[in-house]
From Swiss-Prot:
It is found in: Nucleus. This is T-box protein VegT. Transcription factor required for both mesoderm and endoderm formation in the embryo; signaling determinants and concentration levels may determine which germ layer is formed. Acts together with beta-catenin to activate genes that are responsible for mesoderm induction including wnt-8, eomes t/bra, siamois, mix1 and sox17. Directly binds to promoter DNA. Patterns the mesoderm along the dorsoventral and posterior axis. Activates siamois gene transcription when alone or in combination with beta-catenin, but inhibits siamois transcription in combination with pou5f1.1/oct-25. InterPro entries: p53-like_TF_DNA-bd_sf (IPR008967), T-box_DNA-bd (IPR046360), T-box_sf (IPR036960), TF_T-box (IPR001699), TF_T-box_CS (IPR018186). Residues 308-325 have a biased composition (Polar residues). It comes from Xenopus borealis (Kenyan clawed frog). GO terms for biological process: cell fate specification; positive regulation of DNA-templated transcription.
Amino acid sequence: MRNCCRERGFSVGCLEPETSFSCASDVKPSPDMDSVSSQDSLYLPNSIGASLQDQDLWSQFHQEGTEMIITKSGRRMFPQCKIRLFGLHLYAKYMLLVDFVPLDNFRYKWNKNQWEAAGKAEPHPPCRTYVHPDSPASGAHWMKDPICFQKLKLTNNTLDQQGHIILHSMHRYKPRFHVVQSDDMYNSPWGLVQVFSFPETEFTAVTAYQNEKITKLKINHNPFAKGFREQERSHKRDDVLRTLQQSPGKRQKRKKWEDSPEADISDFPKATRVKEESVMDPAVVYQNWVSDHEANQGLTPHSPESEGVNQEQQVPTSSLNFYNKSQHRSSQHLSSPYDLGEPSSRRLTPDVATVPDSDQDSLAVLHGIPTQDSAQERTCSMNISMETPVKQPLRGTIYSSYGTEQWMVPAQGQYQPVGYTAYQTDLSTQGAVAHQHSGMSDWSQYSLFPYSCW
């Protein structure tokens, strides 16, 4: 294709980056072009032209020295490359491409507010060409609106696989626009080729802006610039601060209200509501655990004197006493709430869970100690005495609430064993079989229950 283009007098810029053309008039057709018919001469390369859009903006950057940011992931250009084409065949298919070529063989650095050469340029990476996404398209499509390369990205990653344009930092480049007549990008041969470039689009590739003037131009004209967003946020913060600022009259009014007694009274209803909250009396919920002696003395588990008792494990009384006490308690009223404020100085016994004296008597029987009169048995599960000012000694704690009969050893012959014949089929004839036994050891062969257990 290159040879074919040379025969016709054209140059392929993407294949020969050292050759470029600034405008369509630089193309010199060969003498053989005179044999082309007049109809085809309307669409010769001499008739194809291009103009740069946003030329004023590009000129502002060009005067200060345009800089383009390159990153590893790729960064879009600003100003964007945007051109307009004319002179194309309305129905012919064209492809539009762009590539970047170095301006010289030097590396640059920013020194004393100006760019200066700092050595020889690095080897140029493989030439990459960006194809416009609309390619191929008819000449009417390309000439209808300006052509923008907004998705083109620049990168410094030499191993890039995303199709971005690879450039070196601190090197100067310029973009070139190629118009190729072709119906298919891959199969059909390329036809006429026209190359355009504009001096205003020259730039220096950098990883960070060096010239402050370029930074200001980017902020002022690029709404997506980071500095522009930071400036907007600062303006918003200033607006918020202005709205929060109050006039002197409002501040004085606020100070007068805080000094007035109304500010203190406004919180008073909250305190009264907290104090008036009622607390459920635990004696109502746990009536069975309140002894008769406590009810008579006006001491409930809710009182301050009984906090320690409530935290101890309560020892229930026997089932018979519990039944009698529950009936007796149901006919009585609870103690007066005025008794709850009993001073702690009148508490003469510690908060220790104790058991009735009947259990003490049973314990004495086991150890062979003579028991006290059974009439002295108390029905309360907690022994709290408030009649005498003398401090009483602690009673022993026992972990059983059963009667003394469980500890008594039965005499010989007290139980009359009853047994049944294991193989007797007539249930009506079953009866007790009397046996004479001399000791307890002979009972082990007979059942103690008058019925069979499965």
